[in-house]
Amino acid sequence: MARVTVEDCIEKVENRFELVLLASHRARLLAAGAPLTIDRDRDKNPVVALREIGDETITADDLKEQLIHSMQKYVEVDEPEAETVPLLSSSPAAAAVAPQSSSDDAAVQFDRMSEEDLLRGLENLAPPVETDDEGE
């Protein structure tokens, strides 16, 4: 690797360790068939990756985001939460349906189970069926 290439990249990515992570990730992408943003000039993938970062044909922020996504095992999906719609009608029927007060919420009680009952319930569960995975 040319020292000039690394010095150009340090101006774009200040942390050398982060630069190594980003350049190696980009080099792996190039090896996997990602399109080049600059001419190769008989350079290997790590040098091409550093030249792309140094010439800013690919941004360090984009590479960082791609690196994070490639390392994630589970992708969190934000699902919209169901919203409750308040009643707009002031009719007597609507007043009968509407909750009376928040003190009713405090009166809600749940069934309690002793530890012995819980253990007896767990003992009655069927054990999982074992499969023979050695043949694969």
From Swiss-Prot:
SMART domains: RNA_pol_Rpb6 (SM01409)
Domain of life of the native organism: Bacteria
Regions of compositional bias (Low complexity) in chain numbering: 89-107
Catalytic activity field: RNA(n) + a ribonucleoside 5'-triphosphate = RNA(n+1) + diphosphate
EC number of this enzyme: 2.7.7.6
GO cellular component: DNA-directed RNA polymerase complex
Molecular function GO terms recorded: DNA binding; DNA-directed RNA polymerase activity
Keyword Transferase among UniProt keywords: yes
Cross-referenced Pfam families: RNA_pol_Rpb6
Region annotation Disordered: where it falls in the sequence: 79-107
GO biological process assignments: DNA-templated transcription
InterPro entries according to UniProt: DNA-dir_RNA_pol_omega, Pol_omega/Rpo6/RPB6, RPB6/omega-like_sf
Keyword Transcription: yes
Keyword tags: DNA-directed RNA polymerase, Nucleotidyltransferase, Transcription, Transferase
Quaternary structure annotation from Swiss-Prot or TrEMBL: The RNAP catalytic core consists of 2 alpha, 1 beta, 1 beta' and 1 omega subunit. When a sigma factor is associated with the core the holoenzyme is formed, which can initiate transcription.
Function: Promotes RNA polymerase assembly. Latches the N- and C-terminal regions of the beta' subunit thereby facilitating its interaction with the beta and alpha subunits.
Family: Belongs to the RNA polymerase subunit omega family.
PANTHER family for the chain: DNA-DIRECTED RNA POLYMERASE SUBUNIT OMEGA
UniProt name for this protein: DNA-directed RNA polymerase subunit omega
Organism expressing this protein natively: Methylobacterium radiotolerans (strain ATCC 27329 / DSM 1819 / JCM 2831 / NBRC 15690 / NCIMB 10815 / 0-1)
Gene designation per UniProt: rpoZ
